């Protein structure tokens, strides 16, 4: 959305789950197949001013989505470099390093033959017709394929198009499949129908709706998209506030929107010298990351379900640093840690409830 300075804020991206591939045999283990819930940018399928035949593998779209250098595409005279900095590619501008580590490399089939290995991709024509993904088999109008615009897209996005619909209005979005000829690519209409004949690859008025597969082994836990890290006001025990140092019962949630907390394997956080006395857990720690919004946090898992959360120690680099001894965590009153109820401590960057 735009702020008062006419600049666009970087809001969290909402992703639609097309399939839960937990337990499905794949190269990466358990995965979620995700598609952007809205159109996220406006960009040509291929950056060219001439009529050239191009495949998905050679397109500047694939390079821009994944931050590839000029050797991966045939844009311009000798390829276009999208690896220089975060402003150049979708991958680097939309995801942190930790989030990128949770994106599974995916082999996507190309209708022109062969496969390409990518992290971020566009849906194919056939994928937009699979009922298991929530789409209609028919190529005609389908509400499940309708994609609305973010404020950035409504404002013209990367190409500066003046023909985009308003914010939350529906627009056309690219597919990776080729169109009728080699210089055309397929797309989905703003009414949810799909058009296999496609449009010219240098069309600057079509939106982008990226997709990727999330490696669930890189996910620490999930929480409600709104209120997932805030207390249940009707709960019992130590759940009346959000102050640092408290572990509270997480509010109940029956919605469909979730956010994930991903692992950061570069962190060297470790816990030692753990002692439990009544409702108090005493511990020492080392290898913590300090700075803005850095904390030692805790979750309690009961019978496999996440029930409690709290930020127990602020690591601002002043009072608490990279290591510490004899720190305390208070377990909610009436709760006992055992084989069915476990406490986990971890170092996180807190980005809101």
List where the protein language model places each region.
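Short, conserved beta-strand segments of beta-strand-rich sandwich/propeller modules, principally
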Residues: 340-344
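Collagenous Gly-X-Y triple-helix signature in extracellular proteins
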Residues: 1-337, 347-350
